[in-house]
From Swiss-Prot:
<protein>
    <recommendedName>
        <fullName>D-alanine--D-alanine ligase A</fullName>
        <ecNumber>6.3.2.4</ecNumber>
    </recommendedName>
</protein>
<dbReference type="InterPro" id="IPR000291">
    <property type="entry name" value="D-Ala_lig_Van_CS"/>
</dbReference>
<keyword id="KW-0067">ATP-binding</keyword>
<dbReference type="GO" id="GO:0005829">
    <property type="term" value="C:cytosol"/>
</dbReference>
<comment type="pathway">
    <text>Cell wall biogenesis; peptidoglycan biosynthesis.</text>
</comment>
<dbReference type="GO" id="GO:0005524">
    <property type="term" value="F:ATP binding"/>
</dbReference>
<keyword id="KW-0547">Nucleotide-binding</keyword>
<comment type="similarity">
    <text>Belongs to the D-alanine--D-alanine ligase family.</text>
</comment>
<dbReference type="InterPro" id="IPR011761">
    <property type="entry name" value="ATP-grasp"/>
</dbReference>
<keyword id="KW-0460">Magnesium</keyword>
<keyword id="KW-0436">Ligase</keyword>
<feature type="domain" description="ATP-grasp">
    <location>
        <begin position="144"/>
        <end position="345"/>
    </location>
</feature>
<dbReference type="GO" id="GO:0071555">
    <property type="term" value="P:cell wall organization"/>
</dbReference>
<keyword id="KW-0479">Metal-binding</keyword>
<dbReference type="GO" id="GO:0008360">
    <property type="term" value="P:regulation of cell shape"/>
</dbReference>
<feature type="binding site">
    <location>
        <position position="314"/>
    </location>
    <ligand>
        <name>Mg(2+) 2</name>
    </ligand>
</feature>
<keyword id="KW-0573">Peptidoglycan synthesis</keyword>
Length: 363
């Protein structure tokens, strides 16, 4: 019997359009012999809408103009309703029971623990990390503190909260130039600036605070940008390493999703075998330290001196046509459809384990 999978996509973050691209690819690749799909789009106002597959997207082939169609039927969510957690508002009818949710909402409200907490309240199994790991990995400040305390190398950094003051001279006294200013809770390089002088610093702070109340100010690292994909729960596996060679100054949003020809992807990365193994080992260490489950992409800088420095850990990496996570697994021998299947199985296994835990001390 087919499992019922709800693909949840869109959302209210600045990565809404990226999410739509990810959803389109997963929907096209999933094994229809094994899974029956329910498509749930979340619009930029936060409304949950059920879509038919025939007309859920407009401008689907244009990453800059892709958007949800106007055909969705609004849903309400009912925690505690066994098998009927999703109800169409207009008809009052519940959707067919959902066995597992595959969340593809990137950024705020999607991979920061908010959606994961909601799905936990709805008692629906879901693909990917749980609440704590999602929240910790979304906040670059928290991620780096946890990794640093575990003895895993990260770039030197400072944190600036809205309302606090920090001059360029103060930052430059602690961090070598160039510096990168990043919103602490954004992904896909949204709001990120490379800074080499005082004027650029002021502009970078202004831009960053448009997207977050907390900024990470990080020392630039001269090194190769290497990424690994991790898959699994307690016994996770790591893919081959890949490398991003950007023609721009850094791997910005436009380069990632709009102008893909501005970067070259090398899979596998052209690293010595022993160094590649070390990178993969550190990826697995970070995955465990942060409590990840299901999947994550771990991004590194690897210097000429063979230093391995973690840049970030993404618990819900992109599944677009140019995204590294599925490409890394394809190069490791796992097809797109099989990867999706493995992720769903991992989600169901984790849910089965959770059901074994006692929640009532008097039962």
């Amino acid at each position: 019997m087919k499992k019922s999978v709800a693909i949840v996509f869109g959302g209210q973050s600045s990565e809404h359009e990226v999410s739509l691209q990810s959803a389109r690819n997963v929907i096209n690749a999933i094994d229809r012999e094994s899974y029956a799909l329910t498509l749930i789009g979340v619009d930029k106002l936060g409304r949950w809408l059920r879509f038919d597959e025939a007309d859920y997207l407009l401008n689907a082939n244009d990453p800059a103009r892709i958007k949800l169609s106007g055909s969705g039927k609004q849903l309400s969510l009912l925690p505690g309703s066994v098998g009927g957690q999703f109800v169409e508002v207009e008809s009052g009818k519940p959707l067919a029971a959902i066995d597992v949710v595959f969340p593809l909402i990137h950024g705020a409200f999607g991979e920061d623990g908010a959606l994961q907490g909601l799905l936990r309240m709805l008692a629906v199994p879901f693909v990917g990390a749980d609440v704590l790991a999602s929240a910790a990995c979304m906040d670059k400040d928290v991620t780096k503190r946890l990794l640093r305390d575990a003895g895993i190398a990260v770039a030197p950094f400072m944190v600036l909260n809205r309302g606090e003051s920090l001059s360029f001279a103060q930052a430059a006294a602690q961090l070598s130039l160039p510096m990168f200013v990043k919103p602490a809770n954004q992904g896909s390089s949204v709001g990120v600036s490379k800074v080499s002088d005082e004027a650029g610093f002021a502009a970078a702070l202004a831009l960053g605070f448009e997207f977050d109340h907390k900024l990470l100010i990080e020392q630039g690292i001269v090194g190769r940008e290497v990424e690994c994909a991790v898959l699994g729960n307690d016994e996770a596996q790591v893919s081959v390493c890949g490398e991003v060679v950007a023609n721009d100054e850094f791997y910005a949003y436009d380069t990632k999703y709009l102008n893909g020809d501005q970067a070259r992807i090398a899979i596998p990365a052209e690293l010595p075998a022993d160094l590649s193994d070390q990178v993969r080992d550190v990826a697995l260490q970070a995955y465990k330290v942060l409590g990840c489950a299901g999947l994550s992409r771990v991004d590194f800088f690897v210097t000429e001196a063979r230093e391995i420095i973690i840049n970030e850990v993404n618990t819900l990496p992109g599944f677009t046509s140019i995204s590294m996570y599925p490409k890394l697994w394809q190069a490791t021998g796992l097809s797109y459809a099989e990867l999706i299947h493995r992720l769903i199985v991992l989600a169901l296994e984790r849910a089965d384990e959770a059901r074994l835990l006692k929640r009532d001390i008097f039962a």
